[in-house]
């Protein structure tokens, strides 16, 4: 298998900084595709093998790690006080950011995600393997609306 590591590197170095500017490294549930997400001083990382992990970015200490549904290739995104993680089986899991692993909701579409969601205002743009969806929050108490674009 491919060696996967997450590195924290001080940004002020020049040249080969391997011995002088690497703050920490971790091999704990690191994915091949998704980018890490920094929210309110915590670093969130998803792994291909159904894990979601929260790190202390200054030290690399694991705050928590837990299993999530499906396999993720898309990067997690943060919007409106929540973290959204889409998987290859079509589920989007919604998390509360923080030092405790807390799932708020799971929503499922017919096809899986490889692409990361895009956020614009109150709208989410979700590209599955077969469709492009736009999901938008309506004014308070009115729920959400969704539209789908066929290829």
Please place each PLM-identified region on the residue numbering.
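Noncatalytic, solvent-exposed loop/strand surfaces
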Residues: 1-151
């Amino acid at each position: 298998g491919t060696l996967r590591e997450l590195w924290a590197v001080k940004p002020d170095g020049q040249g080969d900084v391997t011995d002088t500017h690497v703050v920490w490294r971790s091999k704990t549930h690191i994915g091949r595709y998704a980018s890490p997400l920094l929210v309110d001083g915590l670093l969130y990382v998803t792994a291909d093998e159904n894990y979601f992990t929260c790190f202390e970015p200054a030290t690399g200490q694991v705050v928590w790690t837990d299993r999530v549904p499906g396999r993720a290739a898309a990067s997690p995104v943060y919007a409106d006080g929540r973290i959204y993680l889409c998987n290859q089986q079509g589920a989007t899991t919604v998390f509360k950011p923080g030092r405790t692993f807390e799932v708020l909701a799971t929503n499922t579409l017919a096809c899986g995600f490889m692409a990361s969601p895009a956020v614009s205002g109150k709208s989410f743009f979700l590209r599955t393997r077969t469709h492009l969806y736009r999901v938008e929050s309506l004014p308070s108490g009115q729920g959400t609306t969704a539209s789908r674009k066929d290829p």
